[in-house]
Amino acid sequence: MSDLHDLDSDSAVYKTLLESTKAIPWKIDWASMTFAYIGPQIEPLLGWSQESWLNANDWAMRMHPEDREYSVNFCISQSQAGVDHEIDYRALTKDNGYVWIRDVVHVVRNEKGETESLVGFMFDISERKKTEEKLISLQKELEALSFKDGLT
């Protein structure tokens, strides 16, 4: 009896830990491609409710069209091969904006080594991407200025 209580208590603690981070935890069943879980953090970030994330198609269709084909194909091929992976893409918000996401994926395999499920975390990397874009812009400005300088 005590072991069951401890297990329930541990489970509640782990759930609280997962749901109190800024990262968005998720799990997809590989055979059905349905979400077994997605953290409540998804709604404040993207505007879509937890309940609206039913399957992998919901994930793919809420991705920027320019990122979709590569991202989906990359994730499928890595997952089929049983390889953990990371990918950056732009996710559609409910109000038709975009947020840069880094998806970190761990492939869970059964005793035969076959892919059973995918678990991972989504991270909002929008600020990092804005900083990268600004650095690229500044670098181009510096290059342009260096060609205008009569000393070079």
Residue ranges and their predicted role:
Residues 1-13, 66, 123-140:
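PAS-associated C-terminal cap
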Residues 9-59:
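PAS-family sensory domain signal
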Residues 28, 121-123:
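PAS-associated C-terminal
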Residues 30-31, 94, 111, 126:
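Short, ordered coil/turn segments that flank beta-strands lining enzyme active or ligand-binding pockets
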Residues 39, 96, 149-152:
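Conserved metal-coordinating catalytic motifs of nucleotidyl cyclase and c-di-GMP turnover enzymes
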Residues 48-111, 115-118:
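PAS-family sensory domains
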Residues 140-152:
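Conserved nucleotide-binding and Mg2+-coordinating catalytic segments in signaling enzymes
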